[in-house]
Amino acid sequence: MFSWCALLAAAVLPPCVSAYQAEPVPAVLSVLTVDRYADDGAPGSLRWAIATANQAPGRHRIEIAAVGRPPYLIRPASPLPEIKGPVQIVGGARDVDGQYIVIDGSAYVRGKGTDACPGAEKGQFGANVRTTTLPGLVLRDTQGVELSGLEIRNFCIGVLINRASGNELHDNRIVANKGGAGVMLTGDDGSGQSTATTTVHNRIVRNEFIDNGDGLELTRGAAWNLVADNLFRSTDANPEPSQGIEILWGNDNSVLRNRFENYSDGLQINWGNRNTIAANTFTGNSIGVSVSGRGNVVDGNTFSGNGIGIAVRPQPRSEANRFSANLLSGNGLKIERCQAGGACVPGQPRGAIVFGVPGLEHASFVGSRGLGVDTDPSKRARICAAGESANCQPAPNHGQAPPRLLALRGGDGQRELQGEFAGTPRSRYTVEVFGNRAAGSDEAERYLGQLDAVVDGDGHGRFRYRLPPDSADLANLTATVTSADGATSPLSAPLALAH
């Protein structure tokens, strides 16, 4: 019997290749052992190992041995050579006794706090000013670099990934890098302009980021990168607790299952598009997530004990960003930590989801924009007041108003929520329903479910939602609505449940 499958296979597969053939076995790498911590360039030093591996990218693995007793400390006297991949650089102690090999920049990054770390513009210093100054390890115009088992501390930028793709940083500690970020992924072309497709498919997983200015940045074209299972923590020792992660003109990145503690903003998106922020935990931040841009998805995260859970910032044109299935409780605290972010405007509304929160780009922002940055309010954008539209920025998410929860009908496990909302005529919306156990809560402690609702020709939408059986312990309900293009409203006013 004639086989079209066999003919097709013969046509598209080279000789002796099966569709089920495993990928080739990786070549055996030559190991360069670092067993001398003096920074003199001699064989056995880290400087020697990087320079040697750079001569033949793809052929070496650098293993840094644990010499003596911890802490295992390498203190470079001057900037190390940029790293050319593919290459692995591994601190050997972590998998043995949990210790890290420390690469410490304090021998040549000198000065008090952020003053040691000037930005690219003269007179500017600190996090959230453009900079590539004094990094520890540099991956520039390269690919395939793997870093693990390292503690990188006391630089202006711990690891700079500049126009570099397909790299992986895992199981490291990134500590007290004060001027730019713990790890900076940027497509910066050298003059501050973005480059597309140069800083993609990097993986930053299972690292600890402690007391950096910004923990991590995805900026100027950084796209399709994964940041997962990391801890971003700021303590009282941090002089400039800015963002756990800043995304600036970065698109299509995935930030998953991380924890963000005690920053001005846990995560800040500045005109980034289609980024996915999912299954993370935000606590103790002035703002959990601060959003501008379009098509971003904030889904299934937990926000507790923040000033604002999700802050949605105005921009020149109102764009749609989606917030779905997030758990929000205990927010609304007066956390006035405003280092290039946060919520410090007197009388600022706080709580679960707040529209119209000013950022650095707005004249009404209160806080630090970075040392040396021009603060003239006449050069900043105005946020439109109610009923205003000229020379100001409109409400975000198309100004989508929250739904109104009208009544609860039925009983004995058959309770049905009834509500209404305003929307675009003849269009579909998604309603998400939440519950709270505390009678005074107006947040979204528990996610109950969702339903679709259609708006009639007069712009009026109605919905009914049957509550699940496990909702008997709830004191009240709240809800959001999301348009077909992904613009989510703030939470509704709560509707009390009679027991």
What are these regions (language model features)?
Residues 486-498:
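Edge beta-strands of extracellular beta-sandwich domains
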Residues 85, 133, 165, 200, ...:
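Residues that flank catalytic or metal-binding motifs in active/ligand-binding sites
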Residues 3-15:
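Bacterial N-terminal signal peptides
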Residues 40-43, 292-294, 317:
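Electropositive phosphate-/nucleotide-binding environments in soluble metabolic enzymes
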Residues 145, 150, 167, 172, ...:
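Consensus "Asn ladder" position of solenoid repeat domains
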Residues 117-138, 154-162, 176-199, 210-222, ...:
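Extracellular beta-strand/beta-solenoid scaffold signature
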Residues 16, 20-158, 163-165, 327-349, ...:
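N-terminal, post-signal-peptide segments of secreted/periplasmic proteins
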